[in-house]
Amino acid sequence: MAHGCSGGAMSRFVFLGVALALLGGATSPAAAAPRVTPVVVDVDDYGADPTGRTDSTPAVAAALRHAKSVDRPVRIVFSKGTYQLYPERAETRELYMSNTVGADQRYRDKKIGLLVEDMHDVTVDGGGAKLVHHGLQTAFASIRSTDVTFQNFSFDYAAPEVIDATVATTGVTDGHAYRVLKIPAGSPYRVNGTHITWLGETSPATGQPYWSGVDGLQYTQIHDPEAQRTWRGDNPLFNDVAAVTDLGGRRIRIDYTTAARPADAGLVYQMRLIERTEPGAFIWESKNVTMRSMNAYYLQSFGVVGQFSENISIDKVNFAPDPRSGRSTASFADFVQMSGVKGKVSITRSLFDGPHDDPINIHGTYLEVVGKPGPSTLTLAYKHPQTAGFPQFAPGDEVEFATKRTMTPLADAHAQVTAVDGPSGMDHTKPLTTMTVTFDRPVPAGVETGGTVVENITATPSVVISGNVFRNVPTRGILVTTRKPVLITGNRFDGMSMASIYVSADAYQWYESGPVADLTIRGNSFTRPSGPVIFVEPTNQVIDPATPVHHNISVEHNSFDIGDVTVVNAKSVGGFAFTGNTVRRLDGADHPPYTSPLFVFHGSSGIRIARNHYDKGLNTSVVTD
């Protein structure tokens, strides 16, 4: 099979393909043209090292550059080995993305280990390879490309920007409490007196660590491997420290001035910094992008960001730590964040285990009106510091104007964009937090500076989330706010620490848009959930049942195995059905009855609750106001 390394071989390959096509056409003039056989580009032919002994970054970049020059479908293939990818010679691009570091110029240049850019009909097939990324970099990206598939490989980071410290033992010696921590390989550290400095792997180029931090870093969550639960909480490891001793073998003893024996043996303290300096993977201005049959063992600094793209599919991807690593964290923050995507988002048959934020978040962005330079023109601004620097609108897009206080559309609320002057997503020559947008008609009456937000409703997807498993999640399971049809079906949620499914629409904090109009939650299982299990909470300050924010939510044929929690808490919904569901108690009917009402509604109408099965001892009250 041709590998695209020899010009002569390539010419013969192309000629043979043309000849076969002509022969097929001669025998059947009306037949459709056969699919063009893709050119195969093997990264090993460019010097990539599947033994994992040397840096494969330059070779992988060279293979991708060659693949880009091939004017036909292409498969980029790896051997079934281990490839090391360092950031020093990775492709570098100035990029801005949603929910990361906004316009912060310290982080504008992103290193990308595997970059598909301005390409069409390309498959990156790992063939069972493992890609090990070093330092702070994005594992892979698709930028301005179409028909892109990433498949059949695992990726991990040699030194994750998270420390998973397991409390191996606790005790008391001479009246002083102590803990012994076990630290996974890939988390270098140095003991300095009564402190620990965490060192994020040494760069071979500079001799300095890629990142560093002290003691509990900036954020902690706690994982209980036995109970299979993870939650956000305080970090007691570095309080009242008397001494820190490196015992060797990646074990650290911390002695305390206090006397009470710590009661947290077996727990894992997952500690990290808070700057989301780059996404783990990035899909931007691309169409028909698929991630399939992959192990995402860790996502550095953030998750997979899909941004202003069309049709994204994630199928059979294990977002979970490598079981051989000794780690319990698989993402610095979210696993999947879809921002301003159109077409269809499909997330199926995947595992979400061990994030530091929400596994799936699908939303748009509200831009706030900050100026009216003309009758048909507005100045709009990003309002959350983590999101800035990239375009939100293009000529031809349809927008909707909404009032912040009510979160409902203005009268005559839609217009079409005709011109945009704002950030490009790739450079800092223009202001990164504001843009001027011109529409095809005068802006509607009622648009107010500081009181109106604008959403790009062209860049909203239909969504299918099916057949997935969510566990060891410290936050919500799924966040979704899109006006297109959403189906959440056949998923298993176990031990969520916040709402399993959360629907917001937020014009006050995160500015994540917008309303849902057709949401079906069907055939899922919710086990050991926190309450409320399904939480609808738009940020409207004025609540009027006659003008709800969200519409047409159906919860049907699901099973809920719960403690004493509320199943549904919904605000500002017009049309909510809860039918054919089974709600069971976790502790059995011989225990005292639960007191939490199963259903709470605020400012909602069209509520239908019917044909459900409830265990005895549940509070089936429906609370409305």
Curated annotation (Swiss-Prot):
Family statement: Belongs to the glycosyl hydrolase 110 family. A subfamily.
Superkingdom classification of source: Bacteria
Ranges occupied by PbH1 repeats: 342-364, 460-482, 483-505, 516-537, 573-611
Which species is listed as the source? Streptomyces avermitilis (strain ATCC 31267 / DSM 46492 / JCM 5070 / NBRC 14893 / NCIMB 12804 / NRRL 8165 / MA-4680)
The EC number(s) attached to this protein equal 3.2.1.n1, 3.2.1.22
Signal peptide range = 1-32
Q: Which reaction does it catalyse?
A: Hydrolysis of terminal, non-reducing branched (1->3)-alpha-D-galactosidic residues, producing free D-galactose; Hydrolysis of terminal, non-reducing alpha-D-galactose residues in alpha-D-galactosides, including galactose oligosaccharides, galactomannans and galactolipids
Q: What is this protein called?
A: Alpha-1,3-galactosidase A
Q: Which Gene3D superfamilies match?
A: Single-stranded right-handed beta-helix, Pectin lyase-like
What InterPro entries does the annotation carry? Beta-barrel_GLAA-B_II, PbH1, Pectin_lyas_fold, Pectin_lyase_fold/virulence, RHGA/B-epi-like_pectate_lyase
GO molecular function ontology, one term from the record: alpha-galactosidase activity
Q: What class of enzyme is it?
A: hydrolase
Q: Which UniProt keywords apply?
A: Glycosidase, Hydrolase, Repeat, Signal
Function of the molecule: Alpha-galactosidase that specifically removes branched alpha-1,3-linked galactose residues present in blood group B antigens. Has no activity toward linear alpha-1,3-linked galactose residues.
Do you know which Pfam families this protein is assigned to? Beta-barrel_GLAA-B_II, Pect-lyase_RHGA_epim
